[in-house]
Design a protein with these regions (language model features):
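Active-site-adjacent structural segments surrounding the nucleophilic cysteine of cysteine proteases
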Residues: 1-72, 114, 122, 136-138
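Conserved active-site-adjacent core of cysteine acyl-enzyme catalytic domains
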Residues: 20, 55-167
Length: 167
């Protein structure tokens, strides 16, 4: 008998993502005081023709007006319990995953450190953004920011110090 060497099993390689994707724009909503989570979630849901606003999300997520924080699991729970949509949340995301989700047609709600620092009055704080596009050629992400502006560009990468806290 002749011994034949087994050929290596081919390794599947991921399909490369396109260099640029921009989703249709959800309805922009400027946040009320300390209301970036409810406002950004409302913008996200408007992408799916939800028809309500941050007054609805805020009333459920922050019934106490002095509450300045909404956790990611609370946002997902709101979607799963108060709408006909389904949401999940994860820690440890990366830029490739954000791009893959946007490429698949899903805006991505992320939590990062707030910038610009000149607008912060009480030290570090978290802030939600809704990523709706990217362009690798010019190293650019496009996000809706409920505090700063409707269509906020990020040049290059998400600054690591703003992202690391949530990974």
């Amino acid at each position: 008998p002749t011994l034949i060497a087994a050929s290596p099993t081919p390794t599947a390689s991921p399909t490369p993502l396109p260099g640029a994707v921009n989703l249709s724009q959800p309805e922009y909503e400027k946040q009320g005081p300390n209301n970036c989570g409810p406002a950004t979630l409302s913008m996200y849901l408007s992408y799916y023709d939800w028809g309500k606003n941050q007054l609805t999300t805020g009333a459920a997520l922050k019934p106490n007006a002095k509450d300045v924080n909404v956790m990611p699991y609370e946002l997902a729970d709101f979607v799963n319990e108060q709408t006909d949509k389904r949401a999940l949340w994860r820690y440890g995301g990366d830029l490739h995953t954000i791009k893959a989700l946007v490429n698949a047609g899903f805006p991505v709600m992320i939590e990062k450190g707030f910038e610009p620092y000149s607008l912060r009055s009480d030290g570090w704080m978290g802030h939600y953004n809704l990523v709706v596009g990217y362009d690798d050629e010019i190293e650019y992400f496009t996000a809706h920011d409920s505090y700063l502006m409707s269509y906020a560009p990020w040049g290059g990468q998400i600054p690591q110090e703003l992202w690391d806290t949530f990974i």
